[in-house]
Amino acid sequence: FNLDNVRPGHFLMRYYQLFPAKKDSLALDLLMSQLENQPRTDEGVWWHKAIYARQVWLDGIFMGLPFYTLAAPTLAPGYETDYYDDAVDQITKTDQRTYDAATRLWKHAWDETHQMFWANPTTGLSQHTWARALGWFTMAMVEILDALPESYEPRQQVIDLFQRAMTSVVEYQDATSGVWFDVLDVDDPRNYLEATASSMFAYCLLKGHRMGYLDDKFLEAGIKAYKGIIKEFVKQNANGTISLTKCCEVSGLGPENKPHLDGSFEYYMSENVRDNDPKGI
């Protein structure tokens, strides 16, 4: 029960819509079956993975819900509205559980038990806002909106949340470079401008404006971000190719046998930074 494993289903579903084939149908059914049986919190939000029991991560919303929403009319014909309702419910409950009013940002994850070593014992929240996790959360909204019919009334809830999230994202855009730091809620010289999250935010700003979800001020921020990505991260190599630099390779929270993955700022800064990470390119 690993939501990361479901993410390729979104691409496969789009391919299947163009070129239907039995072997792909079997794979799609298998992925949908996983989601239909994925363990959930008491409030009905999927666990990120079985090894992260009763935990909701922003990452997981992107890994599972876009496929779930897109595939519903094909894999559950006649019941797609139930899937849409579930998707909107999960994303709004994730908002409610991970949003931090003090920073106007969303924390990386929430532990339902409030007992994980990385979790605040009062709120269950992890310590910080990891930029890529928030990038995944905002990209999930864009992709879910692609799949929800315009006639589906609760779709507006996702638009409202997306507008609120991108307002906060723009507030944290670095004024000089136009891109974003790896940990958004920490002002520290060790923090660094990070390419994968910056690419995600640029995508959300530009597509959000193109689709009519965001007004012109967000277009300006998106163009600034795009230019910043080229200037700050894109490097021309000696052989004539280009690289996307300053990509965080990975960041996580636990499990128990990895106590150094504690969600501290120091932990996020300890993870490897490399060129051309697939999550950026």
Question: At which residue positions do the language-model features occur?
Answer:
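Well-ordered alpha-helical scaffold segments within catalytic/enzyme domains
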Residues: R7-A21, L65-Y79, W136-P154, S199-L214, ...
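Extracytoplasmic mature domains of secreted/periplasmic and thylakoid-lumen proteins
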Residues: N2-Y68
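His/Met- and acidic-residue-enriched segments that coordinate or traffic transition-metal cofactors
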Residues: I61, L65, Y83, V88, ...
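Long, well-ordered core segments of solenoidal/helical folds
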Residues: F1, L26-V45, Y84-W118, I159-S177, ...
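Non-catalytic alpha-helical scaffold/packing segments enriched in small hydrophobic residues
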Residues: W136, A140-E143, Q157-E171, V179, ...
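CBM-like carbohydrate-recognition segments
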Residues: F1-L3, K22-L26, L31, G44, ...
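Residue-level recognition of membrane-helix boundary sites in multi-pass small-molecule transporters
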Residues: E80-Y83, F218
